[in-house]
């Protein structure tokens, strides 16, 4: 099993798809990494040679991925909260940040509905 950036890449997948298991690498970046490392996109991860894996590791190392990227995102959110910006307050309250409506919908961000006390006579 290939290990790149601290992540076990699934051996049955093609190299391009397998690289997307790494946080911070999507399809486009995975394709560019494979092309730069001279690895065929359709080659399965289990069939990659040690030299090819090493070339892929070198190219992945150029990007901010996994733990470093997660930390960077968290620090950016924390900075917004500390500055007291509108976006920071929305993050803090667990509401949508990018201007979406909240009167209806937004259930993913707000969580499950809370039971309201009924005011029946």
UniProtKB/Swiss-Prot annotation:
Q: Which residues cross the membrane?
A: none
Q: Name one GO molecular function term.
A: tRNA binding
Q: Quote the cellular component terms of the Gene Ontology held in the record.
A: cytosol; small ribosomal subunit
Q: Where is this region: Disordered?
A: 91-121
Q: Does the keyword Nucleotide-binding apply?
A: no
Query: Which Gene3D superfamilies is this protein grouped with?
Result: 1.10.8.50, 30s ribosomal protein s13, domain 2 (4.10.910.10)
User: Which InterPro entries does the record match to this protein?
Assistant: Rbsml_uS13_C (IPR027437), Ribosomal_uS13 (IPR001892), Ribosomal_uS13-like_H2TH (IPR010979), Ribosomal_uS13_bac-type (IPR019980), Ribosomal_uS13_CS (IPR018269)
Which Gene Ontology terms describe the biological processes this protein takes part in? translation
PROSITE patterns xrefs: RIBOSOMAL_S13_1, RIBOSOMAL_S13_2
- Keyword list, A-Z: Ribonucleoprotein, Ribosomal protein, RNA-binding, rRNA-binding, tRNA-binding
Q: Which domain of life is it from?
A: Bacteria
What the protein does comes down to:
Located at the top of the head of the 30S subunit, it contacts several helices of the 16S rRNA. In the 70S ribosome it contacts the 23S rRNA (bridge B1a) and protein L5 of the 50S subunit (bridge B1b), connecting the 2 subunits; these bridges are implicated in subunit movement. Contacts the tRNAs in the A and P-sites.
Which HAMAP family does its entry note? Ribosomal_uS13 (MF_01315)
Similarity comment text for this entry: Belongs to the universal ribosomal protein uS13 family.
Q: How does it assemble?
A: Part of the 30S ribosomal subunit. Forms a loose heterodimer with protein S19. Forms two bridges to the 50S subunit in the 70S ribosome.
Supply the name of the protein: Small ribosomal subunit protein uS13
Q: Which organism is it from?
A: Bordetella petrii (strain ATCC BAA-461 / DSM 12804 / CCUG 43448)
**Name of encoding gene:** rpsM
């Amino acid at each position: 099993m290939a290990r790149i950036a601290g992540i076990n890449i699934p051996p049955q997948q093609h190299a391009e798809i397998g690289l997307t298991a790494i946080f911070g690498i999507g399809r486009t970046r995975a394709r560019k990494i494979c092309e730069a490392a001279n690895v065929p996109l359709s080659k399965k991860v289990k069939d990659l040679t040690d030299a090819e894996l090493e070339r892929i590791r070198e190219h992945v190392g150029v990007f901010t991925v996994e733990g470093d990227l997660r930390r960077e995102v968290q620090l950016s959110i924390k900075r917004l909260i500390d500055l007291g910006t509108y976006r920071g307050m929305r993050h803090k309250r667990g509401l949508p940040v990018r201007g979406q409506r909240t009167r209806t919908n937004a259930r993913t961000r707000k969580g499950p509905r809370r039971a309201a006390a009924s005011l029946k006579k």
